Amino acid sequence: MAKRRKSSRTKAKETNWQERVIQIRRVSKVVKGGKKLSFRAIVVVGNENGQVGVGVGKAGDVIGAVRKGVADGKKQLIDVSLTKASSITHITRGVSGGAKVIVRPAAPGTGVIAGGAVRTVLELAGVKNILAKQLGSSNPLNNARAVINALEGLRTFSEVAQERGVPLEHLYT
């Protein structure tokens, strides 16, 4: 009976998640007997419907590292407010370490114009039309976290309308 309950819980949580590995790196730790090798995986998890997260996993084998990265990414999910044109609501910037990212909304039909880890994060968030530029560091982990930082700073149309004291319909025109 416990098995049946557990499987129904996992089915309810699993809602069409996609995962993409950005980087797998072999890392080593110096111990008394020599070097201990392990793998670090950077994974982006998203549902292409406004939720995305970046996770890092370390393990003795690649599959274990990816599995841990996916679990970590699901713990760090954020919600992204998208427009009707599958873009973001306004221009925003994100920083993580030495990586800086500028993200701008784009007209329908533009596509995702971004590179590397930034592109992967935006695609799995469900953004279809966007312009993004990486500045500073080219480190995939810092760039992925910088995009997440930028997307966390987004405000919805209703928040902007409330701050300005303007009806929501006036923002669309």
UniProtKB/Swiss-Prot annotation:
* Annotated protein name in UniProt: Small ribosomal subunit protein uS5
Pfam families for this protein: Ribosomal_S5 (PF00333), Ribosomal_S5_C (PF03719)
Gene source species: Rippkaea orientalis (strain PCC 8801 / RF-1) (Cyanothece sp. (strain PCC 8801))
Q: Describe its function.
A: With S4 and S12 plays an important role in translational accuracy. Located at the back of the 30S subunit body where it stabilizes the conformation of the head with respect to the body.
List the keywords (alphabetical).
Answer: Ribonucleoprotein, Ribosomal protein, RNA-binding, rRNA-binding
Record GO terms (molecular function)? rRNA binding; structural constituent of ribosome
- Record text on subunit structure and interactions: Part of the 30S ribosomal subunit. Contacts proteins S4 and S8.
Q: Which family does it belong to?
A: Belongs to the universal ribosomal protein uS5 family.
List GO terms (cellular component aspect): small ribosomal subunit
SUPFAM superfamilies with a match to the protein in the record: dsRNA-binding domain-like, Ribosomal protein S5 domain 2-like
Domain S5 DRBM: start-end pairs = 17-80
What are the GO BP annotations of this UniProt entry?
translation
Written domain comment of the UniProt record:
The N-terminal domain interacts with the head of the 30S subunit; the C-terminal domain interacts with the body and contacts protein S4. The interaction surface between S4 and S5 is involved in control of translational fidelity.
The record's annotation in HAMAP family points to: Ribosomal_uS5_B
Q: Which PANTHER family match?
A: MITOCHONDRIAL RIBOSOMAL PROTEIN S5 (PTHR48277:SF1)
